[in-house]
Amino acid sequence: MDHHKQLTLQTTLESCNNLYNLLFNSIGSIKPSQQQQQQQQNQKNTNSVTSNTNIINDQEIFKLNKFHLYGENNIDELYNSIELQLQTIKFTCQQYRQWDSTERDSIKFFNTQKLYNQSQQRGNLVSKTLFDCSLLGKIYLNQQKEQQQQQKQKNKQQQQQPQPLVEDLSKNISKTVEVKRKLGLLAGKLQEMTNELNNKYSTFSVLDDLLGLLKSNTEIDYNSDSYVSCNISSSTFLLDIDIYHNGEIKEVKLVHILTTTGEVEPAEQQFNDELTNSLKTDMKEFIKKVQRICDLDLLFRKYKHFDLQKAFSILQSDFLNISINSNIKYIDNKEIEMNKGFGEIKLDCCGVLIKYFQSYIEKISKMNEPYSIMIEMESSAVTNNGSLIDQSEYSRLSLKTLLQKQQHTQPSAQTDYSEQQQQQSISTQLTSIEFNEKDCLDCEPLSSMLESDSIFSPVRLVCKLNKPILITNQQLSKILNLSKIHRSSQQPSQQQPSQQQQQQQQQQQQKKLNSVDESMNENGDSNIIENINELIKKYSIQNLLISSSSSSSSSNDSNISVNVDNSFDCEVYGMKQRYYYTGEFELGIEISRIPIYHPSQVYPTIQLLRQQIVFNILFKSCFQNLNISKSDDHHNIIDNNNDVKIFEITSNPPNSINIIFLHPIDNSFNSIDIFIKNNGDLEAFYYDNTTNIQPNIQKSTLFTKMLIKSLSISVSLACFFKNK
């Protein structure tokens, strides 16, 4: 019994440990190998570990730039799963205590459970073996029978009309074999997918008709319009897959089941067409779409006390109204709608897809997909007492309304002046930025807005980026401040700490900082400051952008390591260029998702992302190869330095980039200041001399036009000097 209890507890602990490892891998922390652990243990035993060694080991194990809540996975959901596993361990231990009091019953229970599990496993194994043997046997018998029938037909046809009928028969046989093979592959992939869905989401799948067609011994007319149906179902959806007898996909149909009334509501035809095309062309893409449908269904079932389906319909209705108004406004210029307006909005079966940026070069070359976000629902964080931390509001309120609501909210009597000043600074910071696309295109409904049109959901919204984006901390803070405005407008009367309490907290924090400084001075560890500066430089957005551009342009040589300390040479349209980065460093992180709490946050977020994307593209354009042949060395150094134009780059991401260079004819230092607005608009100012106050208007206008079209500093400079 003790051995069985130990195994049961060990199984639970292993499950919890796997979830911990999944959490750490998701946020960028890599579990050290056994060899690394042994080396660290040996170093500890010999007391020879230095602070520098610890820092290096920590950097190898822990990826600092990925430790945030905006990566690919939902960290809160993983954390909640771990909490659930810990509760399971707690209840298991409590159950053990009860079993110890009744030892005899426990022995009988465990023996019975053990025999039951063994019998069930053996029964499942026997059933699976019988099913596989039956399937293989039927296929074999079917092939034998078909061969006999074909041989008989062949003999008869040879007697009547030998040559033509034999050829037709061979074609039919080959076609039958091909169709059987196609049906078998499709059935295998669908069965593998449905088994995974059934285990992960507790869905119910039926593939009997397809398997029956595959095992059928009767002759089938593969040219007819007959088809079989397979389906995947759950509490809130039904997915029908119609397949022709020749193995071609007829149609995929999605049906929604309302949890409140149980009524069946067919999905939009465009959603069915997307599912059908993905199943025909890309099975992996189809599986991802079905998994997203199951994820949404899992949320609907988890929060069945709340009508999430209504919240989801309100969300799609809001963006449908925005899409209609946006199409009317930009009916003659879709490029401006994509890059300057709200974006190209398209409803999805599990959310809302918004394509918000695509450069001119990418559009005409069709090399890359546009930048886009997918707005979906996801689980939010939970406090210790089980209450939800994050809640999203689904309504047709604009961001301007939220700002006005907060500005007109009267603070409570206990609210401190510093808190009021902080809230006012947030509002001022955001209102000073030109966010409103005419207040989100006046997306209120045509009829008067009802109270039921604004509801709060226990799950939050999330904007999932189709491409990870490197973003500065400053830009990310602006996005997070949008959430602060929404939350403060939800709870205007929340009691704030008094001024005395805030002063006490500040004094305690200051004492902690002073103690840390004193300990650093006593130890004389000046290397810590150097290490911090090195980390800031390593994880700066400038270094990350240069590293990504150099790795993509020199993918053939994995040993190349280009960073901000190196110069970078390139040749564009016959002009040899060399770039140095001599500016300050700004910390940056890579984000893949942005949680939001109100649909009105989407447009300001898109504007800030456009600004960051344009900065990233321009900055990287100085440090990547364009239609040139590489030299033999690792850094692509141009051998002949006589005709090389040298440019020094400084930046204030994502707002501006400054270029300083020596003019080849005037022998004077010229400079170009490039300013990037929050919506991605560009404006360049060309100064004939760094001492000049006024820019050259003609050159500034010309260089701005080149930048807007090319979104490349190196290309614009080459064309600019060639034009002169």
UniProtKB/Swiss-Prot annotation:
Location(s), subcellular: Nucleus
Biased composition range(s): Polar residues: 511-524
Low complexity bias (residue ranges): 147-164, 488-510
Keyword entries, A-Z: Activator, Coiled coil, Nucleus, Transcription, Transcription regulation
InterPro entries: Mediator_complex_subunit_1 (IPR051999), Mediator_Med1 (IPR019680)
Pfam hit, one: Med1
Keyword Methyltransferase appears in the UniProt entry: no
GO biological process terms, semicolon-separated: positive regulation of transcription by RNA polymerase II
Location of the region described as Disordered in the Swiss-Prot/TrEMBL record: 33-52, 147-167, 486-524
Molecular functions per Gene Ontology: transcription coregulator activity
Coiled-coil zones: 140-200
Similarity-based family: Belongs to the Mediator complex subunit 1 family.
Matches recorded under PANTHER family: MEDIATOR OF RNA POLYMERASE II TRANSCRIPTION SUBUNIT 1
Subunit annotation: Component of the Mediator complex.
Role this protein plays: Component of the Mediator complex, a coactivator involved in the regulated transcription of nearly all RNA polymerase II-dependent genes. Mediator functions as a bridge to convey information from gene-specific regulatory proteins to the basal RNA polymerase II transcription machinery. Mediator is recruited to promoters by direct interactions with regulatory proteins and serves as a scaffold for the assembly of a functional preinitiation complex with RNA polymerase II and the general transcription factors.
Protein name (record): Putative mediator of RNA polymerase II transcription subunit 1
Organism: Dictyostelium discoideum (Social amoeba)
